[in-house]
Curated annotation (Swiss-Prot):
GO MF, one example: glyoxalase III activity
Assigned GO CC terms: cytoplasm; cytosol
Role: Catalyzes the conversion of methylglyoxal (MG) to D-lactate in a single glutathione (GSH)-independent step. May play a role in detoxifying endogenously produced glyoxals. Involved in protection against reactive oxygen species (ROS).
Similarity comment: family membership: Belongs to the peptidase C56 family. HSP31-like subfamily.
Lineage top rank: taxon: Eukaryota
Organism whose genome encodes this protein: Schizosaccharomyces pombe (strain 972 / ATCC 24843)
Chief place where the protein resides: cytoplasm
Gene name in the database record: hsp3104
UniProt protein name: Probable glutathione-independent glyoxalase hsp3104
Length: 222
């Protein structure tokens, strides 16, 4: 079974990137649970025409879509038995920069899944949670691992560096460098790009969401 997780602490942040791996996993007949906190509203960056395919736009507009049904039935991380799941999937959107680093129940749950041989996957800004997840030795699971995520060049192209400075955020390049990871940039910032290192799977951006989900399944079955 799959635990596909996305927490949102601030109401202005929800990413339809969540919908893309949701659909990929659903097509595989995967059983999973969404975890969400608080009220969710749209992040304009995530629902712009350039960010979404036609099918994604249709899913966003159709409140009867299975994606929205899953969100309505989402649980808090504290109410989930993580031992029941074999994949932890953290989807991005800039909102995760606010809440993932302090989401201790998610950190512990992901560590539980990882300790059982499960897969930890994350895409776009979702990987911001990874340095917070510890292995059995107490070190971050990304130490010495090869990863990717939404990179600094992409933030610059979106003119978001002033926002990073305002909130004292570190770019994901910097964050993973400090965590002792080998961060790999896609050839172009918005290319479909995924890195798999053992049971750790990361994707660079919205275009990589479906590929990251597929890679997570492949890693689980390898």
């Amino acid at each position: 079974m799959v635990l596909f997780m996305k927490t949102v602490q601030r109401p202005e942040h929800i990413s339809l990137k969540s919908c893309i791996p949701f659909k990929s996993l659903q097509r595989q007949g995967i059983v999973f649970r969404l975890s969400v906190r608080m009220v969710m509203l749209a992040d304009d960056h995530s629902i712009s025409d350039s960010a979404l395919s036609d099918s994604d736009k249709n899913a966003f507009k159709d409140k009867n879509n299975d994606f929205w049904k899953a969100i309505k039935n989402a649980k808090n991380a504290s109410d989930i038995n993580f031992s029941d799941y074999s994949i932890f999937f953290a989807a991005g959107g800039h909102g995760t920069l606010f809440d993932f680093p302090s989401a201790t129940n998610l950190h512990k749950g992901a560590a539980k899944i990882y300790s059982m041989g499960g897969v930890i996957a994350a895409v776009c800004h979702g990987p911001v949670i990874l340095p917070c997840i510890k292995d059995s030795t107490g070190f971050s699971i990304v130490k010495g691992k090869t990863v990717t995520a939404f990179n600094e060049i992409a933030e610059q192209q979106m003119n978001l560096m002033p926002t990073f400075e305002k909130y004292h955020f570190k770019t994901l390049n910097k964050l993973f460098q400090e965590a002792g990871s080998n961060f790999v940039d896609p050839q172009e910032p918005f290319d479909d790009f995924v890195k798999t290192d053992g049971k750790l799977v990361t994707g660079a951006n919205p275009a990589s969401a479906a590929s990251t989900a597929k890679a997570a399944l492949n890693s689980l079955n390898s």
